Amino acid sequence: MWSKKFTLKKLILGGYLFAQKVYCEDESNSIYGTWSSKSNQVFTGPGFYDPVDELLIEPSLPGLSYSFTEDGWYEEATYQVSGNPRNPTCPMASLIYQHGTYNISENGTLVLNPIEVDGRQLFSDPCNDDGVSTYSRYNQTETFKEYAVGIDPYHGIYTLQLYQYDGTPMQPLYLAYRPPMMLPTETLNPTSSATSTDDSSSNKKRSLRSLVRRSLENRHKTNAIKRQNTSFLTSNAIWYISAGMLGVGSLLFLAF
């Protein structure tokens, strides 16, 4: 009798683990989409950076956001505020925008390679800059030793955990949009390396600026949507299936 009961328990547990595996294998390892930190106020896309007027737009709260496409492009939006220990009334703040390409190595290392001429930073130090923030180009390759995608047990949404080059975990990011909300995946502000007679380069830049302007005008009409679980095996479904299997197992355990 004990052998039958033990085998039944193993079957129930195996069925539960299989259901979890089927549900997670589809998207659990994908970084595709727009991810945002807990403040849920910082997102990539035209709401953070206007490449036409080269304007960084300050969110209501600090935070971090990354977006990734399926074909190797990424975008980053960062709003950081750090305290001033000498004068708490003068916190320093920086807004950083970058985009470019990314690659994932066989050992799981994630490397972000920005487009050098497109990165921008707005730095504010009110106690030392006379109220005039510093706006400059920004170019910083980022290397993450590894990353992990999982499901937050409390909110039931996907989370992205990035680990810095030395293995230190960063603040977790939460899936906000899929497909990602991003600016065009090409050089937004190319430098003037060609002559004035280069009509193709000039036309390309005008075309890009028109594309970006339309993106800005339609910032509230993006096709990026809040990510919701649409598959049959959602986290709630798994819970009910598991509870049902455990209930049936308990009845069979008592019956035999």
UniProtKB/Swiss-Prot annotation:
Q: How does it sit in the membrane?
A: Single-pass type I membrane protein
- According to the record, the signal peptide region is 1-24
Q: Which residues are glycosylated?
A: 103, 107, 139, 229
* GO cellular component terms listed in the entry, alphabetical order: endoplasmic reticulum membrane
Q: Which InterPro entries match?
A: Rot1 (IPR019623)
Q: Where is the composition biased (Basic residues)?
A: 203-212
Q: Disordered: where is this region?
A: 186-213
- GO:BP terms for this protein? 'de novo' protein folding; budding cell apical bud growth
Q: Has UniProt tagged this entry with the keyword Endoplasmic reticulum?
A: yes
Task: Please state where this protein is localized.
Answer: Endoplasmic reticulum membrane
Spans within the Lumenal topological domain? 25-235
TM spans, by residue?
Answer: 236-256
Q: Which residues form a coiled coil?
A: none
**Which GO molecular function entries does the Swiss-Prot or TrEMBL record give?**
unfolded protein binding
Per its database record, what is this protein's job?
A: Required for normal levels of the cell wall 1,6-beta-glucan. Involved in a protein folding machinery chaperoning proteins acting in various physiological processes including cell wall synthesis and lysis of autophagic bodies. Controls actin cytoskeleton polarization to the mother-bud neck and CLB2 protein stability.
Q: What family is it from?
A: Belongs to the ROT1 family.
The name this protein goes by in its record: Protein ROT1
The protein's organism comes out as Saccharomyces cerevisiae (strain YJM789) (Baker's yeast)
